Structures are given as structure tokens and as C-alpha cells.
Amino acid sequence: HGGTILFSARSPEFQTEEGMKKAADNMRYHGIEALVVIGGDGTYKGALDFASHHPEFPIIGIPGTIDNDIYGTDYTIGYDTAVNVAMEAIDKLRDTATSHGRCFVVEVMGRHAGYIALEVGIASGAEDILIPETPTDLDKIVEELQLAKKRGKKSSIIVVAEGDESGGAMETAKSIEGKTGFDTRVTILGHMQRGGSPTSRERLMAARFGYIAVKALLEGKTNVAVGIWKGEYTY
């Protein structure tokens, strides 16, 4: 089951004292004594704001975002599944790129982080990977593509993180086609990366994070986030 059975939404009301009081009253009414939140920066900020107004509820955070960009953990729930969904899509694009002798520029999600692009690019054998963390030299990319074509390479795949300084897949493709004349196509994978059945690694990591979160609550911890750091589960 992809997505989230808990549902997810931004609530302007929750950002007010009245909204937080309503949330606290609902928790008391339903006999909820503690809160485990799953999400990214916005979720953590909301949880801390709630804790400052209602410290009587212990709160533990579990990192959940496909971007894998939460400080304090090497892994976030959703990342591995997103990478695998993107990789499967690029494998299919490789087939048609080869058949028609085209250059495909594929944009993946990740906001300002290039983790998805980097991992899926390596895993799928992309000719180039563009990520926000490193400078993008389009002239060098064009030169590499031209050399590859001279060597007889029929097609190419370039993976671009949506937050890269190049301006994303559309701008990158325009530059490549304009400078080389290559038949270039753009594919923006978009929100399909947020769906899909979780991978086995994902399920295992989520179960471990859940266990650690409950363990932290039983030890009396509050306002901490669980994570994995250098192979060790921490909070």
C-alpha cells in the first residue's frame, strides 16, 4: 500500500493556539497519551510548536520524506520506494531511447536535495546526473554526449534533480538540443514517485523506526526524533 492510510494535509488551523487546543482536547477525549509524528521539516516544526503549548503530551518524531533530507538521520521513510519507482521508469525509458536513438532528460523529485537523482542515476546507468549539491556545467555535458555519439552510442539518459541550478529537465533539454541538434525528449516523473508499494527495505526500516519510537516513549523521552546514524538506530 503506497501513500499513507493516515492521510496527510496542511492545516492552517493547527498553526493557531485555538487549533492546537482543539487538537489537545481531541487527544484527551480519545484517550491518546502521546504522539508519534511521521514526516519532514514541516511535521517536526508543527510537533515542536504543539509541544510548546501542550507539554503534557510526549512527542516522538519519525523521519518520513522521499527527499531523504532530514538532519540527524541517514535514511527517511519513503526514500527507497521513490528511488525504485524512478529506476523502473528510467529502465523503460532506456528501452525507447535506444530504439529511437534519442537523448532523454528525466527529472526526479527531491526539492533542494539530490539524493534521489544521484542514487537512481547511478543505479540506472545514466550518462549524466545533475544535482543541486554540485555545480552544473552544461557545456561539459554536451561535450561528453557528442563524444559518446562519435564512439557509436545511440542513446543517452540524463537524470536531473528538480532543484538543480540548470532549471530542471525542460531547460536542460533545450540547452542540449540547441547545442547538439540531438533528438531530445523530456520526462518529468513527478508525483508517481510518491506512490507505489513499499520496498522490502522500506518496510523493515519503518518497522524498526516504529519500535525505536515506542521504546523512546517508554523510557520517558519527549521532543526527540528517531533515526539511523552511521548504522546505529538513535533518538
Locations of regions flagged by a protein language model:
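Glycine-rich oxoanion-binding loops at beta->alpha junctions
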Residues: 1-37, 43, 75-84, 88
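Short, ordered loop/turn segments at secondary-structure junctions
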Residues: 10-11, 40-43, 62-68, 110, ...
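Conserved beta-strand scaffold positions in the cores of enzyme catalytic domains, especially
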Residues: 5-6, 59-61, 105, 129, ...
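Accessory alpha-helical/coil subdomains and C-terminal extensions
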Residues: 34-39, 45-49, 54, 79-183
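Acidic/polar active-site rim loop that often engages polyanionic ligands
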Residues: 62-75, 98-99
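C-terminal non-catalytic interaction/assembly regions of soluble proteins
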Residues: 176-235
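Short beta-strand elements at the ligand-binding edges of bilobed clamshell
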Residues: 70-82, 196-203
